């Protein structure tokens, strides 16, 4: 009986969502869940709270939301540039809220 040939191009399976999760302290001292968003999956434009600039579609970034809220939903998520999130402790507020 002939052996089957392996496909030439195998697609790598995506890692499970729990593997990409991490919990970090936010700029206010609370804990936040942080998940990376690949450039290929970034299809909308968001505003980064760290620098107050747009995160355009096709730009890799992170999504952050509080872990201590029992019903943390879509409204609680924030999209940050990866360097802005990494340097959040050294930045002040970028926008004056009135």
From Swiss-Prot:
Residues 1-10 have a biased composition (Basic residues). It comes from the Bacteria. Residues 1-21 are annotated as: Disordered. This is Uncharacterized protein Mb1356. It comes from Mycobacterium bovis (strain ATCC BAA-935 / AF2122/97).
């Amino acid at each position: 009986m002939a052996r089957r040939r392996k496909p030439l191009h195998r697609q790598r399976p995506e890692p499970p969502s729990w593997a990409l999760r991490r919990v970090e302290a936010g700029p206010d001292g609370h804990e936040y869940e942080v998940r990376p968003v690949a450039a290929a999956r970034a299809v909308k434009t968001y505003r980064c709270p760290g620098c107050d600039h747009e995160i355009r579609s096709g730009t890799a970034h992170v999504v952050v939301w509080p872990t201590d809220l029992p019903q943390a939903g879509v409204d609680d998520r924030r999209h940050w540039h990866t360097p802005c999130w990494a340097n959040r402790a050294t930045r002040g507020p970028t926008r004056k809220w009135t």
